[in-house]
């Protein structure tokens, strides 16, 4: 991160983990398109979160990570590695009920193989009626540094996540003022 750059947090996860819903909940506006069809988000969508004391942070919604992308999605998947290596922090968003361990393993390997563990927070989403003690034991390996249980759709548990994001934000007098951007690849 350079002196004049707003810190960026990426939301990385499988399709339909709730990445776009989380961006919209945190930004308090409809920044990302939400759909039940996997890969509704095909491009990186970035918006600015503003906190008290003129602190700012960019939060980016990425397309869902695919283990075996088709010809249409391969361009978007190729850019994910570039994005995560440039990010200041990564939110590894997991649907708490997911059984796609192969897909989660692929993201886990991407994080580990690129030494991104120290800048990754694991966020279990869709946990509105979930008891933490019922977390599948296989999920524990995906926890980096901190784990949170939230419901982006019901806006539960977001206060703890917002506190983490505030700590990562930077005073706006020290950064270029950028409201939002959309990167279209391909």
Task: Show which residues each predicted segment covers.
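Conserved G1/Walker A P-loop phosphate-binding module
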Residues: 1-83, 94, 167-186
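Conserved nucleotide-binding/hydrolysis micro-motifs of P-loop NTPases
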Residues: 39-40, 64-66, 97-99, 126-130, ...
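Conserved C-terminal guanine-recognition region of P-loop GTPase G domains, centered on the G4
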Residues: 51-55, 75-146
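Canonical P-loop GTPase G-domain recognition
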Residues: 118-121, 128-181
């Amino acid at each position: 991160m350079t002196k004049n750059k707003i810190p960026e947090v990426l939301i990385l996860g499988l399709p339909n983990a709730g990445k776009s819903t989380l961006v919209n909940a945190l930004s308090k506006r409809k920044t990302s398109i939400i759909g039940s069809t996997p890969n509704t988000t095909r491009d990186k969508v970035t918006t600015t979160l503003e906190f008290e004391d003129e602190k700012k942070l960019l939060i980016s919604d990425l397309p869902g990570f695919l283990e075996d992308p088709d010809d249409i999605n391969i361009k978007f998947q190729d850019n994910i590695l570039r994005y995560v290596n440039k990010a200041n922090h990564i939110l590894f968003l997991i649907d708490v009920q997911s059984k796609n361990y192969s897909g989660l393993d692929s993201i886990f390997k991407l994080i580990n193989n690129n030494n991104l563990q120290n800048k990754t927070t694991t966020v279990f989403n869709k946990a509105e009626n979930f008891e933490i003690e019922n977390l599948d034991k296989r999920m524990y390996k995906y926890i980096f540094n901190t784990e949170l249980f939230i419901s982006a759709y019901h806006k539960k548990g977001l206060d703890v996540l917002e506190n983490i994001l505030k700590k990562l934000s930077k005073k706006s007098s020290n950064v270029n003022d950028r409201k939002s951007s959309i990167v279209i690849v391909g």
